[in-house]
């Protein structure tokens, strides 16, 4: 049995439990925590997470953020200057974070997303060093209708999440889903 098998089993249990509609936005966030080296296996099996969601009677909407920074930078007016002087990019990263939050917010509030939907965020590792996952999730908290599932390649220590094992961690009200619960 693999780590992803156990994570999938734990997720299937979580998604099938009746949802409390009175919880606040931060408590509507589920963090599926897994070791970063399991990323490829998770991506190969993402359809099984979608199936588990649908079998539990909920909608599934996947938002892959993997290419978001590259796409944003490629379309940026000053992209050539940033490649020449990468330190200048630091000032523009706040704009990227705001645009990323707006993109996720649009997905969370799309017409086809309702109180019984799971919106899953994938590709969070690609944000490392350019945007903080904690800030992204906090920026969209109030827009979560059903549940926001964040596939989180990192660690959970108590109630602190650490992206890729680095100190981008934060103490958060999100509900953790780990393979040890499978």
Name every feature range the model reports, one short phrase each.
Residues 15-19, 101-110:
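Short, charged beta->alpha transition segments
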Residues 28-31, 118, 147-149:
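Residue-level preference for the first positions of well-ordered beta-strands
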Residues 40-46, 72-75, 129-135, 159-163:
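A short acidic (Asp/Glu
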Residues 59-105:
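Long, charge-dense
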Residues 114-130:
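Conserved P-loop NTPase "ATPase switch" module shared by AAA+ and STAND
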């Amino acid at each position: 049995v693999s780590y992803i098998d156990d994570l999938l089993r734990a997720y299937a249990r979580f998604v099938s439990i009746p949802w409390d509609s009175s919880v606040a936005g931060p408590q509507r966030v589920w963090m599926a925590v897994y070791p970063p080296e399991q990323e490829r296996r998770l991506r190969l099996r993402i359809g099984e997470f979608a199936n588990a969601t649908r079998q539990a009677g909920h909608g599934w909407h996947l938002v892959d953020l993997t290419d978001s920074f590259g796409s944003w930078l490629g379309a940026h007016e000053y992209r050539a200057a940033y490649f020449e002087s990468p330190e200048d990019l630091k000032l523009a990263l706040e704009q990227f974070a705001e645009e990323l939050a707006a993109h996720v917010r649009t997905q969370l509030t799309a017409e086809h997303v309702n109180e019984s939907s799971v919106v899953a965020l994938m590709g969070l590792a690609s944000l490392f060093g350019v945007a903080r996952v904690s800030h992204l999730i906090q920026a969209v908290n109030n827009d979560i209708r059903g549940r926001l599932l964040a596939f989180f390649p990192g660690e959970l220590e108590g109630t602190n999440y650490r992206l890729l094992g680095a100190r981008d961690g934060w103490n958060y009200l999100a509900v953790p889903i780990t393979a040890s619960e499978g």
